[in-house]
Each structure stands twice: as structure tokens, then as C-alpha cells.
Amino acid sequence: MPFSNSHNTQKLRFPAEDEFPDLSSHNNHMAKVLTPELYAELRAKCTPSGFTLDDAIQTGVDNPGHPYIMTVGAVAGDEESYDVFKDLFDPIIEERHGGYQPSDEHKTDLNPDNLQGGDDLDPNYVLSSRVRTGRSIRGFCLPPHCSRGERRAIEKLAVEALSSLDGDLSGRYYALKSMTEAEQQQLIDDHFLFDKPVSPLLLASGMARDWPDARGIWHNDNKTFLVWINEEDHLRVISMQKGGNMKEVFTRFCTGLTQIETLFKSKNYEFMWNPHLGYILTCPSNLGTGLRAGVHIKLPHLGKHEKFSEVLKRLRLQKRGTGGVDTAAVGGVFDVSNADRLGFSEVELVQMVVDGVKLLIEMEQRLEQGQAIDDLMPAQK
């Protein structure tokens, strides 16, 4: 299991060029940004908790690229990482988030009343709807760098806060280490639980250390509101249900998330946030809202159409396979979600998904009738 070696201070005895990683066959955002000069400039720096440049880039060094998506190739180990290593992270953020500038300010809107429509996506096409985000608790290191004690303290805090939720959000916590293999696998197969730590991002960044210690899932009684604890982020908050009522899913998401934040504040803890980057998370790809609003949608005709990728790009949407990022579409079912995280509010992102999915369904219906879709091609959003 590869883990970063950056705590070896002996490396500073070697010149920077001798320690610079071989990125010659790499295709990720980190590799595009990191030059020998930048490495030399940043390699001796560390955050107050001891996180170094080599810690940040190890996952991108060990994983040159991905056949389907452009990976980031770097992670943060604490809130200060984005500041101490801003010369690495700022260009990555600009490239990953559509030209987002170091002077830009992020906006947050968690008022579901501002969402137009979204309660009537056709269930003949939309099989399920889901909204997720991540949150990090200020004062703790992030998962690539946190200690066992920190991780256990985060778990304890989260479980105490979540146990105060009531009504439709009332539920219970299931620690990973007290589950049987069969129970774990069932929750994974049902798309409720995060996968076992086989992802290169988790392994190479050090996020899988001590697995499954202090990891688990909290969910309400009908499994429509879930919180993952200590996977890639301190908290992953998920609202999901069958069918196409994205409005209901988003309303539950906003209500639950706001209540969780209030409960943490009552214990004198707050979430990592700043006006420029919004909510701070482990992977730079999730900064800002951290929000992914997605549907599992049946598009057997449009999914094979030569313009499908172009349509999604213009709608600022992205597609994944039925089982997630590394998988194929089974039976013409795609996971379609917003492509952006930073620079747009939560409501704006969910609105893009709602409006875009309606158009995708209209296109699919045209193709079912053997008709052309050229006149439905959207302008670039």
C-alpha cells in the first residue's frame, strides 16, 4: 500500500533536482503545473501541522493519469495547505474550475426555495436523484494527514451531532469496524456506502491509513439522508431517493446540512470555509460548494448519439457510468451531474442539472421517434 515518504527530512540533503519526481509520462493537473523550479521553491516549506509539498503531490506522482477523466494529482492535508502551497494549488484550481482566479470570491446559496421546478423530472427516464457535498471541521487535519486520535475525535463529534437530528432525519450510526463483510458489501452494492479503500487516490495520498478505524456511515431510517464519516473528507453529506423529484432531494439536503452545521457550532466547532475557496475539502476538485447533484438517467438512444458529449459540455454537465467514475453505462443508464463546484452557488448548480436533464429527456424522446435533435442543441452555458 503506497504511502507518502515526505516525513523523511534527510531528503533536504539532496539537491532539489535529485528529489524532483519523474513526471514525463503523467497526465494530471499537478504534473502540468509542477516544474523543477517550483518544486525547489516549495519543497522545504510545511504547514503548521507538518504537511509538505511531497505529501500534497504523492497521489499524482503514483497515479500518472486516468483514461476517462483529467485527475487533479494533488491533495490538501489541512486548511493551511491551500495557502502555504498556493503557487501549486492556485494554477490547478484555475485550470480545474474553468479559469477561477485567485482574486475571485465564491458564493453560497442553500435556500431550496430559490430552485425553480425540479419536482417533475420524468420517472420513466430518471431512476434516482442525489445531491452530495463534503465538509471539513476546522482545527483538524484533513484525511491524508490526520492522526488516529484526530480521526476518532472527528467520529465522536460527528456521531454526537448527528444523533440530535430528529423527524425525517432521525437515524443511527454504523461503524465500519463493527459491520460484517456481507453488511458492508450490501450497503456498497445499494450505493449507500463508500467503497473499500482500493481507489488509488485514497491509497497513495495516505487517506486509507488505519482502515477501517473511525470510519462509518450514519443514515436516517429510510436511507434518504446519509453522512459518510472519515473517508476522503471528514464528512460527506448525501440526500438521495428513487425517481425524479430533485426538489425534494435538494430541500432535504439543505435542511439536514444546515442543521448539522448548527449542531457543530453549538459544540464550538465550525466548518472550514473562506470567501475565496468556499468550503475547504481534501481534493481541489471539490472546493467551493463540494456539491454534486446527479441523476441516474436512461438514455439508450442519446447515449449512443455522436453529439451526446457536446450536448453535456454545453449544459455544463458530466457523465459517469452506472456505477460511478470508473464504470461503463449499463443498459443505457448514465450518472449525469454538474461539472462545476466552485464559482457557482449550490442552487445554481442544481438548477443547471434540473434544466439540463429536462432537455436530455426531450432529446431522448425525439430519438425514440426517429426524429432529429439538431434544433434542440443548446447554446454554451
UniProtKB/Swiss-Prot annotation:
Record keyword Lipid biosynthesis present: no
Domain (Phosphagen kinase C-terminal) ranges: 125-367
GO cellular component term of the entry, any: myelin sheath
Localization of this protein: Cytoplasm, Cytosol; Mitochondrion; Cell membrane
Region (Internal MTS-like signal): 130-138
Catalysed reactions listed for this entry: creatine + ATP = N-phosphocreatine + ADP + H(+)
Subunit structure: Dimer of identical or non-identical chains, which can be either B (brain type) or M (muscle type). With MM being the major form in skeletal muscle and myocardium, MB existing in myocardium, and BB existing in many tissues, especially brain. Interacts with SLC12A6 (via C-terminus); the interaction may be required for SLC12A6 potassium-chloride cotransport activity.
Domain-level remarks: The internal MTS-like signal (iMTS-L) mediates targeting to mitochondria thermogenic fat cells.
Protein's name according to its UniProt entry: Creatine kinase B-type
